[in-house]
Structures are given as C-alpha cells and as structure tokens.
UniProtKB/Swiss-Prot annotation:
Protein role: Trims short 3' overhangs of a variety of RNA species, leaving a one or two nucleotide 3' overhang. Responsible for the end-turnover of tRNA: specifically removes the terminal AMP residue from uncharged tRNA (tRNA-C-C-A). Also appears to be involved in tRNA biosynthesis.
Annotated binding of Mg(2+) 2, by residue: D23, E25, H181, D186
GO cellular component term, pick one: cytosol
Active site positions, chain numbering: H181 (proton donor/acceptor)
Family in the record: Belongs to the RNase T family.
Cofactors required: Mg(2+)
Name the record gives this protein: Ribonuclease T
Subunit structure of this chain's protein: Homodimer.
Lineage: Bacteria, Pseudomonadati, Pseudomonadota, Gammaproteobacteria, Alteromonadales
Length: 224
C-alpha cells in the first residue's frame, strides 16, 4: 500500500498535525499577568496498526516571570510553593527551548507539518503556552496558533463526562486524585484519555473513513 494512502500513519490521521499533549499549572487564570509555574509535555506515537500511544514526557518547573502575579488561592489549590528551591525551576525560555527542540524532532520523525496542542480544557493551556512563548520572544513556534484538540469536549462526546478524573475512570484509566494538579500526572492521564478516544473510534469503525478506505482499495487494485 502506498504511504500516500496509509491511514495507519500518524501524519495522515490528523491532517498532517502532530498531537502534543500539554498540561500547565499556574498562579491564576490570567495568562497575561499570572505566573506559569509548571508544564509537562507528552509526545505520542502510532504503531503499525494505527493505534496511538504515549512515547515520552518532558516536565519542567518554571520560575515566575518578572512581575508575575501569584494568586494565593491558585497556589493553595495546586500546592505549589514558587519560592521552594527544591523545585529545581528553570526560566520560561529555557523550558520552551527544550520543548521546541523535542517536539520539532518528533514532528519531523512523524513527517507531520505542524504540532497541535492536546489538553483538557485546552483554551486555558493554549493561552498560557502562547503567552509564555510571546514573553520569551521565541520565533517559529511549532504549535498551531489557535487550533487545539480539547479532551474535555472529546470525552463529553465519546464517554459522556467532561471532568478529567471521571472520564479517565469511565474509560478504565486509573486516576489518583491525590496526584492530580501535578502537570506531570495530569498530562499523562490526558494523553492516555486522548489515545483511548482516538483508538476506540478506530476500533468502532470510525477511522479510516469509507472514502479513504475506498481510495486505498482502488490503489491496491491498480498496483495488482
């Protein structure tokens, strides 16, 4: 089968977009004024059967940018002490340079043309990521400037629940509420949930589309 029509390749699954699962922990809800404190990024891969799975995860504690607002209620909620030296925090720029390098390498390996953020309530994470990139004056961001895959929406459709913990449990994905609100933990659970939904849709016959399958069959007949 020609690579052009192989629906089991990641580059054909999302119109050439490479999905990158992201979760952030912050010191508030305003991406312009409130600090980004933690970020985790999970890269995905697709096997020869077209099943999506986790590849690897990057994780960074972030130093608040100069003049950043730190909302006490937000810090109490996520349990982060921005001044704790044991966090091993790095600057936003250092973190995003490493993230850019890793995601661009994975995107290229998958032969995709751009990355797209996957997140639970994705507008929030996308907003903080975009603003941090802007603050750092980083050029050539690998991420689409506005399109995202929101697992809250996808889970509502596919599973019937929009809360991450509930959706994971309903999908058979273990979820420990004591570990929640850690970017590392939440990102990997979000990645598992996204993979579950994508793979389940395939198993139910939703992918590849009949038109695409017909094109593949026609090409196979021509080659024979």
């Amino acid at each position: 089968m020609s690579d052009i029509c192989d629906a089991n390749k990641l580059k054909h699954r999302f119109r050439g977009y490479f999905p990158v699962v992201i979760d952030v922990e912050t010191a508030g809800f305003n991406s312009q004024t409130d600090a980004l404190l933690e970020i985790a990024v999970t890269l995905l891969k697709m096997d020869d059967e077209g099943m999506l799975g986790i590849d690897k995860t990057l994780h960074f504690h972030i130093e608040p940018f100069e003049g950043a607002n730190l909302e006490p209620a937000a810090l109490a909620f996520n349990g982060i002490d921005p001044n704790n030296p044991l966090r091993g925090a790095v600057s936003e720029k250092e973190a995003f340079l490493d993230i850019f390098k890793a995601v661009k390498k994975a995107q290229k390996a998958a032969d995709c043309h751009r990355c797209i953020i996957v997140a639970h309530n994705a507008a929030f994470d996308h907003g903080f990521v975009s603003k941090a990139i802007e603050r750092c004056d980083l050029k050539r961001s690998p991420f689409h400037p506005f399109a995202t895959f929101d697992t809250a929406t996808l889970a509502g459709l596919a599973i019937g629940h929009t809360v991450l913990a509930k959706a994971c449990m309903m999908a058979g994905i273990p979820f420990d509420n004591k570990e929640a609100h850690s970017a590392l933990y939440d990102t990997e659970r979000t990645a598992e949930l996204f993979c579950y939904i994508v793979n389940r849709w395939k198993q139910l016959g939703g992918w590849p589309l009949l038109a695409a399958a017909g094109a593949q069959d026609a090409e196979s007949d021509t080659e024979e």
